[in-house]
UniProtKB/Swiss-Prot annotation:
Disulfide bonds join C309-C363, C333-C359, C459-C480, C531-C581, C540-C564, C556-C577, C635-C687, C645-C670, C662-C683, C743-C795, C753-C778, C770-C791. Keywords: Disulfide bond, Protease inhibitor, Repeat, Secreted, Serine protease inhibitor, Signal. Residues 365-412, 487-525, 588-629, 690-737, 798-845, 850-897, 902-950, 953-1000, 1012-1059, 1071-1115, 1118-1162, 1177-1209, 1223-1266, 1295-1342, 1376-1416, 1443-1488 form the WR1 domain. CDD domains: Kunitz-type, Kunitz_conkunitzin. Residues 309-363, 434-484, 531-581, 635-687, 743-795 form the BPTI/Kunitz inhibitor domain. One of its GO terms (molecular function) is serine-type endopeptidase inhibitor activity. This is Uncharacterized protein ZC84.1. The keyword Nucleus does not apply.
Length: 1561
């Protein structure tokens, strides 16, 4: 029985603890209910589980536990419902547990909230959800206030148990009151509220009166009562008088007559020890007469709440019982194991609680350190903490109002605690030391504690005697520093140099991350610094719920703090975190240096490159934008040692712009500028030390010295190249890394030195593509780029010379591949270069980039594709062969170079240094920079810089000179020698000396031979490439042009025109090809081609045109006549030939050039027939699918030339000489002659009998009944069937009119009698509404005309009438469905019936000829069409001008002159027309679907000539669908056929192919 009772108690505690586990760490709550655990009564409980992501106990929303046969069984709610405690599975859409929108004051625990007012009393809004305040307890989604023992106001036991374990809510006083556990505890009153005193000794289990019992630890409280070791006390506990406030003993020699005092020296300790009634209540002097107790002594001195909560954790020698203690450092309650049977007092501490709720209520829900300010009452134990300081009461000195849960207490200030007072206003005992050593108790022991010395600002250690003292008493130095740091800084710890706080008098003595707190003289961290610190959970083993500010998300988040080694971004509550870090802007992480701050120390946020000051650029670090220093600014700054922060200093590196090297300097630890690098490599890599054009640093040897390379020095490895770099004012050859080496490095993640890893890109040599990777921010390598475009620019251009980049497609942003075998396959200024990294050719070069003069290119930075800037007053600021040019528009200097390599003015020679073979740059106007005979010159006017060039021209008339291959100097020669200069050059001199230079003998594009026969320095006059002859004796017959004279030529033995200047060459119109090249034209249009594809005629090559921005066919003129081009042989020159002896390639002929030579030129274009096309200069006939071919131009009908045969590409097939899709007709169509035609009704037009119905045929273009059949109700039937049908309709299963001899009106649409209503006129003329013979319905009835002799029979056409006239007359009769002068509404060419649907506006339902049809309204003004008789047009009917076909003209209804409307998918248009949407409206009209060349096409084809007409046939698209009409010559005759496309160079106009002719021709 006893075991069963204990089991019930254990199960009760088990369940009670489980309800409080939610949102607690998993290690703190292991005893929640699980599946298969025992249970007592049937019911349900929420299922709790440990969330592995948060490591917290959570409640399942869809699962729960049900007690079945004394075991908990796991259950699951049905889909769409959630489990709610006390209600079971509920539908959240009917009664939502989580409110989507908060209503003020209506939120329960867990409901969504925005403000505290959205939640009920006792709650606050935490992280968007309503939560209980710390002084309230959760119960069934509501918060109830915790109630102290012996206090009223409880509703549930949990309100009492949260304050003291085992307490219950009793209703013995008609109101719920919390009572201590009966029989085992008694209630005792203190200033902090009532406590429950245990009367049982846990170590022995006895219940004998112990008298001197304290509340804590429960079960061993009698072991911690104060005992003065003085012999006068006789080993009795220190007594007191309950309620007394006396600070001095009333009777000398006796003790316990007042408040708590230490007997040995009389020190008042009543503010740190509570005087509690003995248990049971006795008078100590009477109970213990041998003692020195005063007569009024009736209490025992026990540690106050504030003193108990800062005591250490004591476990005892054999810990076995789980208990909780309050960690004043972390502000949380933590579990430990305790030895309840330990007999010695040194193993017990008042900081010992049975439950976590008791621990939190006792220690957490009060002041952090020290006792609160109490009210003044007559009895001390009746005093209570002041809880309304924020509203009506102000706190006394040394106290500050602090919010704790739902209360506001006056708590000791950190300044009071961290001082000599130690948070004790009544510490009246004088002493010489700042710390209070306490006093030695009978059973206590000494220990080392720490106190804060406000004079030194440091925490010092002292020996604590074990009892008493004050609150400037900390268990560890860390705890002391954490608490008392608030005395110096509002938040965070002061900056320290070793153990001492760094002193300051103003902000200039603190780093920018801190500010000087003048009253304390220390550097405190700024809000920006604290809130930007990363999450640091510490290195200890505790699990404390704290909050930190996530600068990236700008939100406060919870984390588990381990208890030590954290940082300042650590807050006790989410409210503290939010209030302090509100609107804090995180620090952007720059590549180098610190982001820019405003005058208030806040980081400046920019966007889209805007908002940064000079020398700063807008940079995105992966999570935010900030202003970071530019590379040029960083590398130009002087060294800055920064500000002292912390102990010691270090050595860093900076870039010295004067020496252009990285040098070390001593750094004080904080601030400085961005020219600050951790090591030499980082400095050299960032500032590109050594001038390596591709970036990177020069190669160093094993000793760390930079290697020098060259012809006589060490050679560079394959990964580097020997390049002259600028060092100071001189050039030194150094080994610089190649771009291929840099792009071949593996991706290096590096080390994290920023807030987060950032995305970077590297070149993957396996895929030859740029790929992303995560970079830590430091210690990377050269294969690291900010974005994918930088990666492509740098690595795709690795084969290009320095300053040149690969030409990029503006659309794809990828380099364009070129063909090295094709000349000029790259844009102007670019050369086709092989890139081994991507195993392809790219176009390398550069343009002026909008910053360089015309015909010059800029030095392009391959990283960002930007032109390099330079400084005009700094030597060697541009690479070799580049000059510093000024751009007026941008007001900046840029490095520029000639695209063609031109350096000096025309006729001048460039001087090169004999040692480096590099040109000497100079400043124009200075005479001390060039050697003798050379001056500083430039081929550009008004230039600031140039090169050293010869002072005088090399050749006369500034002619070009020949450069010797060996000396790279102008070739010297002597006039009159046999061989001195090669062909095209002549030995000339500026002086009378015979020594001269080889100068070009002709200028411009004219060949050298044009000077033959004329005196020196004169040129012959040419006419169409031939030397023009003249007659000096008869000038009018053979004159010379002006500036030319007729002279005798000794070499040619004739008179010819000679002049000092060559005749101007007629300029050809620009066609986009390079100079001396001609574009191939198709019908006066330049032929466009594809690079690398053989789609240019013979003699032409596919080259890129910069002016036309396209690839086009260009050929070398070579002096060929007219528009022909020369054949270029293996030598790269036009192939020369001899007429009649040399064989030119196919398509070429040996012709005389303008220079007088004979070269292979393309033959002239031949005129081909209309059915032929030119292929490789020859005419070839056009052929259809299945025929042999040479090129696509030959193939017709939409076919293409594949494997020398015209073929149709799938899914098209050859049908009648055309490529068409396989025709699939719908169920209401038939296939005829390759076209789908709608099935026709009787009287409708047809082309084949298959369109007509049963028993009918296509007779002269119309479906008519065959011989022996007559038409009835749209069908062909025999006369017997007609009579039978009429009879059946009349009888209609025996239903007839009530009058004999009367027949009902039959609805032809539904083949049933027409019903009517006897009220009103519901039947047509000639009919009356009668009830049927069965007396069930009313029918429209009329007399049987077949029985009357007065019935008028319509007259038939005379026998002489032709069949066609008979058909047309019948159709006219069929269309006479409206009264005279009124027009029917046509739908798909037929009058619309109104037996089912309503008529459109302007028409009314009218009966005529046994049917109801929509007819135009009679006598409506404005509806009669002028010029027509009885023709009415609806106002809504579109006019021909309003409705238009996509091709051709619409089918017109003559009576209304309007297009015929149709409905797609229902009733189609006549044969030859299709129902398509108008191109000008949403209506569907009948448009032509095929072509006919016959005039009068409408009458013969459709049989509808009297009612349908068409516009001019020429305006109609002659072919169906996408086909066009092509005119060709076949076997000597002209044929017109429909094909897929027009032959080149014709274009389609209105569906017909025409060849546009040039007006000039």
């Amino acid at each position: 029985m006893m075991f069963h009772s204990l089991g019930l108690l254990y199960l009760f505690l088990y369940v009670t603890l489980a309800e409080d586990c939610i949102d607690r760490p998993c290690v703190e709550c292991r005893h929640y209910i699980k599946q298969d655990d025992p249970c007592l009564h049937h019911g349900t409980k929420p299922m709790l589980f440990c969330d592995p992501q948060t490591n917290l106990i959570q409640e399942s929303s869809t699962n729960f536990l049900e007690c079945v046969q004394n075991r908990w069984v796991l259950r699951e709610c049905v889909t769409g419902t959630i489990y709610e405690s006390g209600r079971g599975c509920v539908d959240p859409t009917i009664q939502p547990f989580m409110q989507g929108f908060s209503v003020s004051g209506s939120g329960r625990v867990g409901d969504v909230c925005q403000y505290n007012t959205d939640c009920l009393s006792g709650m606050y809004c935490a992280t968007g959800l309503c939560s209980c305040l710390s002084t309230y307890i959760l119960r069934e989604s509501y918060c109830y206030e915790k109630v102290n023992p012996n206090q009223p106001g409880c509703t549930y036991d949990v309100q009492c148990e949260a304050v003291w374990p085992g307490s219950k809510c009793r209703m013995d006083s008609s109101i719920g009151t919390c009572r201590c556990p009966e029989e085992t505890h008694v209630a005792r009153e203190t200033r902090d509220g009532w406590v429950c005193i245990s009367l049982r000794d846990l170590s022995s289990g006895g219940t004998a009166p112990l008298y001197f019992v304290c509340a804590l630890p429960e079960g061993a409280g009698f072991k911690i009562s104060l005992n003065d070791p003085s012999p006068s006390m006789g080993a009795f506990p220190v007594g007191c008088t309950v309620g007394s406030s006396a600070t001095i003993e009333p009777v000398q020699g006796l003790h316990g007559g007042g408040a708590c005092m230490w007997p040995s020296d009389g020190e008042y300790i009543g503010d740190v020890y509570d005087c509690i009634h003995t248990s049971p209540h006795i008078n100590l002097a009477e109970k213990f007469p041998q003692s020195n107790y005063a007569p009024t002594a009736d209490g025992v001195c026990c540690p106050s709440r504030a003193l108990a909560c800062i005591q250490p954790q004591l476990t005892g020698p054999n810990p076995s019982e789980p208990r909780w203690w309050y960690n004043s450092v972390t502000g949380t309650c933590q579990q430990f194991m305790w030895d309840s049977g330990a007999t010695e007092a040194k193993y017990h501490s008042p900081n010992n609680f049975k439950t976590i709720q008791h621990c939190e209520s006792y220690c957490r829900d009060t002041c952090q350190r020290g006792s609160p300010q109490y009210s003044t009452e007559s009895a001390v134990h009746s005093e209570r903490p002041i809880t309304s300081c924020a509203a009506s009461v102000s706190c006394a000195n040394d106290f500050q109002c602090t919010a704790i849960g739902s209360q506001h207490l006056c708590c000791p200030t950190p300044g009071s605690v961290c001082s000599a007072k130690g948070g004790r206003p009544y510490d009246i005992q004088p002493r010489t030391s700042i710390h209070h050593p306490g006093f030695m108790v009978y059973t206590g022991k000494e220990s080392i504690r720490f106190y804060y010395d406000p004079g030194t600002g440091r925490c010092q250690d002292f020996v604590y005697k074990g009892a008493g003292g004050n609150y400037n008493n900390f268990l560890s130095k860390h705890e002391c520093e954490m608490y008392c740091a608030r005395l110096q800084c509002e938040r965070g710890s002061p900056l320290r140099i070793g153990e001492e706080a760094q002193r300051c008098q103003n902000n200039a003595q603190c780093p920018s991350s801190h500010e000087c707190k003048a009253d304390q003289g220390v550097c405190c961290p700024r809000k920006q610094t604290i809130c930007a610190q990363p999450l640091r959970i510490g290195d200890c083993t505790e699990n404390v719920k704290r909050y930190w500010y996530n600068a990236r998300t700008r939100q406060c988040q919870m984390f588990e703090y381990t208890g030590c080694q954290g940082n300042d971004n650590n807050f006790d509550s989410i409210m503290d975190c939010q209030n302090f870090c509100k609107n804090a802007i995180p620090e952007p992480k720059c590549i180098q240096g610190q982001a820019y701050k405003d005058m208030f120390g806040n980081f400046v946020t920019c966007s889209n490159g805007m908002g940064c000051p000079a020398n700063y650029e807008c940079y995105f670090d992966g999570s935010q934008w900030g202003c970071c220093p530019t590379k040029a600014f960083t590398c130009s700054l002087n060294t800055d040692s920064g500000i002292q922060c912390g102990a010691g200093s270090t050595f860093k590196y900076y870039y010295n712009p004067q020496t252009q090297n990285c040098e070390s300097f001593q750094y004080n630890g904080c601030d400085g500028n961005s020219n600050n690098f951790a090591n030499r490599d980082a400095c050299e890599s960032y500032c590109s030390v050594g001038g390596c054009p591709n970036g990177g640093t020069p190669l160093r040897d094993h000793s760390g010295m930079v290697m020098v390379c060259g012809a006589q020095q060490t050679s560079c490895p394959d990964s580097h190249e020997c390049i002259p770099v600028l060092v100071g004012n001189s050039l030194i050859n150094r080994c610089c890394p190649t771009r291929a080496y840099m792009c071949g490095l593996p991706p290096q993640q590096g080390t994290q030195c920023g807030a987060n890893y950032v995305q970077r890109y590297y070149f993957n040599i396996v895929t030859s593509q740029c790929t992303s990777f995560q970079f830590g921010g430091c210690d990377g390598n050269a294969n690291n780029f900010l974005n994918i475009q930088q990666c492509r620019n740098f690595c795709m251009s690795n084969a290009c010379p320095a300053g040149n980049v690969a030409y990029v497609d503006p659309n794809s942003q990828m380099p364009i591949n070129c063909n090295e075998a094709l000349s000029n396959s790259c844009p102007s200024g670019y050369a086709c270069t092989f890139n081994p990294l991507i195993n392809n050719h790219v176009c390398c070069g550069a343009t002026d980039s909008g910053v360089c003069p015309e015909a010059e290119k800029a030095f392009i930075d391959t990283i960002d594709m930007s032109p390099r800037e330079c400084l005009i007053n700094i030597e060697q600021s541009c690479p070799a062969n580049y000059l510093c040019r000024f751009n007026m528009q941008k007001n900046k200097y840029y490095c520029c170079s000639s695209i063609t390599g031109k350096t000096c003015p025309v006729g001048k020679f460039l001087y090169k240094d004999l040692r480096t073979s590099q040109p000497i740059r100079c400043t124009i106007g200075r005479n001390d920079q060039c050697p003798d005979g050379f001056t500083c010159q430039s081929y550009l006017a008004n230039a600031f810089q140039g090169f050293c060039c010869t002072a005088n021209s090399v050749c006369p008339d500034n002619a070009d000179y020949l450069i010797d291959d060996q000396s790279q100097q102008p070739r010297a020669c002597t006039q009159g020698t046999f061989v001195s200069c090669p062909n095209g050059y002549a030995c000339r001199s500026l002086t009378s000396s015979a020594d001269g230079f080889c100068c070009k003998s002709g200028t411009g594009a004219l060949p050298p031979s044009v000077t033959d026969g004329c005196p020196p320095n004169e040129y012959v006059y040419l006419v169409q490439g031939e030397i023009a002859q003249c007659d000096p004796f008869n000038p009018p017959n053979a004159p010379c042009p002006s500036e030319f004279t007729c002279q005798w030529s000794l070499s040619n033995q004739r008179y010819q025109c000679c002049g000092s200047n060559p005749a101007p060459t007629p300029q050809r119109p620009s066609d986009g090809c390079p100079n001396a090249q001609i574009a191939f034209r198709d019908a006066d249009a330049v032929r466009v081609c594809s690079a690398g594809a053989a789609n240019c005629p013979a003699g032409y090559f596919c080259q890129f045109s910069s002016s036309n921005n396209q690839f086009q066919c260009c050929g070398v003129s070579g002096g060929c006549p007219e528009e022909s081009v020369a054949f270029v042989g293996m030598s790269g020159e036009p192939e020369k030939c001899v007429v009649g002896q040399s064989n030119c390639p196919r398509g070429f002929a040996c012709q005389k050039s303008l220079a007088g030579h004979h070269v292979c030129c393309t033959v002239r274009k031949v005129a081909c027939e209309s059915n032929e096309v030119i292929i490789e200069g020859e005419c070839h006939a056009q052929v259809g699918p299945g025929s042999e071919c040479l090129a696509n131009e030959q193939c017709t009908g939409g076919s293409v030339c594949e494997d020398a045969k015209c073929e149709c590409r799938p899914p098209l097939k050859a049908v009648g000489g055309f490529c068409q899709e396989e025709i699939q007709c719908s169920s209401n169509q038939v296939l005829h002659n390759g076209l789908c035609h709608n099935k026709a009704k009787l009287g409708e037009a047809c082309l084949t009998v298959r369109q007509c119905q049963e028993n009918s045929g296509c007779i002269e273009g119309s479906c008519e009944c065959k011989k022996g059949f007559i038409e009835k109700a749209g069908k062909c039937m025999t006369p017997v069937e007609k009579k039978s049908a009429v009879s059946s309709k009349s009888i209609n299963n025996g239903v007839t009119c009530s009058k004999p001899g009367w027949n009902p009106l039959i609805d032809e649409e539904h083949e049933r009698p027409k019903h009517c209503s006897p009220i009103g006129k519901a039947c047509p003329n000639g009919y009356e509404c009668q009830i049927n013979n069965r007396r069930t319905q009313y029918l429209c009835c009329a007399p049987d005309m077949s029985m009357s002799s007065t019935v008028s029979i319509p007259s038939l056409p005379p026998p002489s009438t032709t069949t066609t006239e008979r058909i047309m007359t019948t159709k006219k009769a069929n269309l006479k469905v409206c009264p005279t002068g009124r027009t029917p509404y046509l739908l798909n060419g037929a009058p619309q019936k109104c037996t089912i649907s309503r008529c459109p506006a302007g028409y009314e339902c009218t009966y005529r000829n046994n049917g109801y049809h929509c007819c135009s309204m009679a006598n409506k003004p404005g509806l009669t069409v002028a010029g027509t008789t009885g023709s009415v047009v609806s106002k809504s009917t579109p006019s021909p001008d309003q409705e238009k076909c996509p091709r051709g003209n619409p089918l017109i209804y003559p009576s209304t002159s309007s297009p015929v409307l149709c409905q797609p998918g229902k009733r189609g248009c006549p044969v030859g027309f299709g129902c398509v949407q108008s191109s000008t409206s949403n209506n569907h009209i009948c448009c032509p679907s095929r072509h006919s060349d016959r005039p009068g096409y409408q009458s013969e084809s459709f049989g509808l000539g009297a009612y349908y007409s068409r516009g001019p046939p020429a305006a109609i698209n002659p072919c169906e669908g996408y086909l066009v009409l092509v005119t060709r010559g076949v076997n000597g005759r002209i044929e017109k056929r429909c094909e897929r496309s027009c032959p080149f160079p014709q274009i389609p106009i209105g569906g017909v192919c025409y060849e546009l002719k040039n007006k000039a021709t």
